[in-house]
Regions:
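N-terminal activation segment of mature serine protease catalytic domains
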Residues: 1-90, 183-194, 200-201, 205-209, ...
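Terminal peptide-recognition signature
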Residues: 20-22, 78, 85, 89, ...
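Sec/Tat-exported extracytoplasmic proteins
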Residues: 23-26, 89-91, 95-98, 289, ...
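Short, flexible loop/turn elements at secondary-structure junctions
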Residues: 26, 224-226, 327
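Short, solvent-exposed loop/turn elements at domain surfaces
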Residues: 28-34, 96, 229, 294-296
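Short, glycine/charged-enriched secondary-structure capping and boundary segments
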Residues: 35-37, 102, 300-303
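Flexible, gly/ser-rich surface segments that form the specificity/activation loops bordering the active-site cleft
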Residues: 47-51, 62-63, 67-68, 73, ...
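Catalytic-histidine neighborhood of serine endopeptidases
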Residues: 82-215, 224-225, 234-240
């Protein structure tokens, strides 16, 4: 309605403090097992062009013990929806889509390739060993220095034969394991719009509350070091008035006693309870987010979200709409 009409600048000024930049650092962990008697793990950064990038065997379950070269990082946009630091975003921001069957096929190719490589190296190393041993056995002109070099070659060859044999046998064993699982291991952090960030260590830790891939919906929560969830003491969920856009924090009706807030009290809280209906007229739409993540967001005045406009081009159903707004990776949310 005209009463609730805002310019692009007014919308940005009122709501941008409730927008957050989301950083998801993640890797995938594969577990192979044979009904509980034996299991082994591999980690990789992503599936690309049919290959598991940066794949490595691991014995660690600690996120921070995994080499950073194995991890991928993606960015997205989130919106604060409660004073306790609950944030809504897209599922694919916190849970990048992948295909378990394609991962399994890529793993099998990787294991077979590793086995073939070991067999090739074993053949070459055994040939070298045979040359060293024959030189010692048949070369009567071999002096002490030459003899020492041949012995060093023999010892090195035998060591590499043992190493390649063990590695190959382990890959053959892994290839025979019948149970296969893939797990996403991630560390999710956020930065408030307008904040000055110099490194990822300054970002705020979050954890996943709900992930609904079918609707591309994700809910994350700002983590408190002493208490991950009950950071607000509420008799019941806060009730939001229909005047959210104008009243901001003052629209919380006293539904209970809030001991303290997770987020700074100058942050805008988005209203998810607006059931306003529209007719079929063309509706102007605004998108606020972080196109290309920190690449465009980092400014001399801190992290800044961008706001763009377009129109709803099609109401597909009650859940999905199509819109004509320019957007880049990082604006998801």
């Amino acid at each position: 309605s005209k009463k609730n009409s805002y310019t692009q600048e007014q919308l940005y000024e009122q709501t941008s403090s409730g927008v957050v930049l989301i950083q998801n650092t993640y890797y995938y962990k594969i577990t192979l097992s044979n009904n509980g008697f034996y299991s082994t793990n591999y980690v990789f950064s992503k599936l690309q062009d049919g290959e598991l990038k940066n794949i490595s065997h691991t014995i660690s379950n600690n996120f921070h013990e995994i080499n950073d070269t194995i991890k991928s990082t993606t960015f997205g946009t989130g919106f604060i929806i409660s004073p306790r630091g609950t944030i809504v975003t897209n599922s694919h921001v916190i849970n990048p889509a992948t295909n378990k069957n394609l991962i399994y096929q890529a793993l099998i190719r990787y294991l077979k390739k590793e086995i073939d490589y070991c067999n090739q190296q074993l053949e070459e190393t055994r040939n070298h060993l045979e040359i060293f041993e024959r030189e010692i056995r048949d070369n009567r002109k071999l002096d002490s220095q030459g003899y020492a070099m041949m012995m060093e070659g023999i010892q090195s060859s035998r060591k590499w034969i043992d190493t390649f044999t063990q590695y190959r046998n382990n890959r053959i064993r892994d290839l025979s394991l019948s149970n296969f699982e893939v797990e996403l291991c991630s560390e999710i952090k956020i930065a408030y719009n307008g904040s000055h960030i110099t490194s990822s260590n300054e970002l705020i830790d979050c954890f996943v509350v709900k992930d609904v891939p079918n609707y591309d919906l994700g809910i994350i929560q700002i983590a408190d070091g002493s208490n991950f969830w009950n950071v607000c003491k509420l008799g019941e969920a806060p009730k939001w008035s229909s005047e959210q856009m104008e009243l901001g924090w003052s629209n919380i009706h006293n539904a209970g006693t809030i001991s303290w807030f997770t987020i700074p009290q100058d942050k805008y809280i988005f209203n998810l309870y607006n059931n306003e209906t529209h007719n079929d007229e063309e509706i102007k739409l605004y998108m606020i987010g972080f196109n290309q993540g920190p690449i465009l967001a980092l400014t001399n005045d801190g992290i800044k979200a961008q706001i763009t406009q377009g129109y709803i081009s099609q109401n597909t159903d009650s859940i999905k709409i199509m819109y004509s707004i320019p957007a880049l990776q990082g604006s998801s949310g």
